[in-house]
Amino acid sequence: MSATVLNGVSDADLESALLDAPVSSLYDIAYTYGQLYVLATEEQVDADIDSEHIRAMTPDEQSQLYDQDNSLLSVRVNLSNGTPTLDDDVIDIERLSWEKAIKVGYAYPYRKRGAMIAHSIAHYANSKGEETTAKYARHRLTRWPTDEAVQQVAESDDQGIVNALAQLGSDDAVIETVTKAVERAVSDLGGTFDGLVSLKIKPPKGNQFLYPGQIPILNEAMVGKKRDRFESYSEAEDSVGAGTDFVTGDEEVPVLGITPGSPGDYIHAKQVEKFPGLDPNRGWQSRPMTVDTAMAVAAGGTVIDACSTYFGGGVEVTYLPYLAGTMDSDDARWLYRLLDDVLEGETITDVLQDRFYERSRRSNRLRAFVFATATDLDRKDKLIHESSEMEVYVPGDLAEAHVRALDAWPFSADDPRQVFSISDSDDAQLSRENSALFQSVLSGQYLKRTLFEPQRNPTKDANAKVFGPAEPRRRSDDRVFGPDNLPLEATIRLVSTDPLPRKRMVRSYARRIIQDQNVLLGAADKNRDFPRYTVLRQYAQWQALHATDAFGTEDFSPVPTIDLNDPPSMSEDTITNETKLEAFINNHDLLAADPERRMAFVLGGLVGRLTAYQDRKEIESTMVRRYSVDSITKRNVARITGEVMSANHDYSAAESLS
């Protein structure tokens, strides 16, 4: 944990950055994240940069460049002698870092879609060749300083820095020099450049070169460009009106409804192309925010992106932690240190697990806003499910209940009634490891590995990542889960304490057994004909879900649970396979109370026992292959029972003769 982050920020500054009321929406969370992120950034960067300017920057947007040498190319401009000129050393190439990205003042539209460009002087060249990189370098002098929004800010530029840059950009000789210098530098790098293209400027009467983000007027211009983009986004020419800020509650202030870069990337502007007949210039009447609030919300996007875990099928589940109740400065430090751990590379599931076992006063107040998004083929993120409150105890309590189920007599090698052996399994859901179970609940794997998966691709199963850190965002190569996907829906319900649909779960369990068996029956390994571990996972999970009251009150009697603490009523001396089977049935009301269900259960057990015998005798056409789960119906069960009983008689007779 970054134990000292925000220690250098005063209580007064922290509390002025916080909302005066408890968090009540995703916007509130994003605003809080953005405000704290800006304060932490300002604290950590060794440069005198105003927090208002940092709030508009996006240093993490191209964070992959931090691991690369030669990832920042700057054209050196000297404005110190009254006449703007290029420096004798025209080009400077160095390694970009997070702090340097702040000093450069890099500002990019959050989760950019389409052909949008950066608001800052710095522009990203994505592995571009000599000519394209040189073009980007020229534009730092020809296009950026002459932008309309930048020129409006230039009117208050006492030092004339913006116009001096524009003057250089209008000089053909200067542009030719820049072009040749950049092309030569990129050629020396192997012909391509992957990094930011920017400027280094020695300001009027200055004695050293500075990055653009270290020069206030250039930051003002960058903010002006971003403000202009907010106000005229999409079809709107001017979306500003007078209203009450949706987040802060400030009344009668200039507000806008256009918020490109909103949290989760699914709360977006009113767009006339999506809602015919709407006036985009009146977008401020929907979730109105001031520009400052909108920028804080957008700044929170960096933190929000870090709080996602990959569910599968192009779906991400995002957990956004917050504290219940109104926060004070110490609460803010505690919360941001949690978030900073995620920003520093820990997974959100790891961090939430650590806080669960912390068992502190604040961890008891810890909640999370949860939502799931899917990336469709048009490369836009779609909201599938959301919930405003997850309490951290939910996955922790469920993990502990699951371990108790695995310690109970059906799995216990110390109990003569044991029916399930899991000693040979390294499956996380059968390993009694609380930490793995906790994370599997949050990642969705806990239910994804037991419930039927629609559109499942069996060819990917062997390489599927079951537990661990979230995988990278996936795009068009993955199938997309829709709102009818029960594993995803049930995961969001489970962590949000919304009741699980019990009947749908039971049907889905059965379909998953069939699904997994069909995969096994089609595999080259003929010794694996039945998804044993799927059934064991389902059994332990069912007990754990009931133990934590995860189901609703829908009528489904009798409740199919057992007394996990029931003491053994028989000893090793008296136990037989018959008495063990009888004990199992008698301890499960759902079997004991229903003759048809009991008969089907015993039939399945007999098919399994005969298959084990056939495997020992190396008989390839086994009973479980002949009578797979999905082949048995109410119409043919009587015939199949007779055939299985006949086979049992024949094998018993043959065994007696041998």
Regions found by a protein language model. Give the residues of each.
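Short cysteine-rich clusters marking metal-coordination/redox-active sites
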Residues: D245-G249, T290
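Short Cys/His-rich Zn2+-coordinating modules
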Residues: G213-E235, H268-P276
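Short, flexible, mixed-charge glycine/proline-rich loop motifs
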Residues: R229-A242, D279-G283
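Short beta-strand-alpha-helix junction that forms the catalytic/metal-binding core
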Residues: P276-A296
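Extended alpha-helical scaffolding segments
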Residues: M1-T192, G206-Y211, I217-N219, E252-G257, ...
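Structural beta-strand/beta-sheet cores of well-ordered domains, especially the beta-sheet scaffolds
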Residues: G195-V197, G241-G243, S286, E316-T318, ...
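Eukaryotic N-terminal, low-complexity and coiled-coil-prone scaffolding/targeting segments
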Residues: A242-G243, E251-E252, P260-P280
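Class I S-adenosyl-L-methionine
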Residues: P203
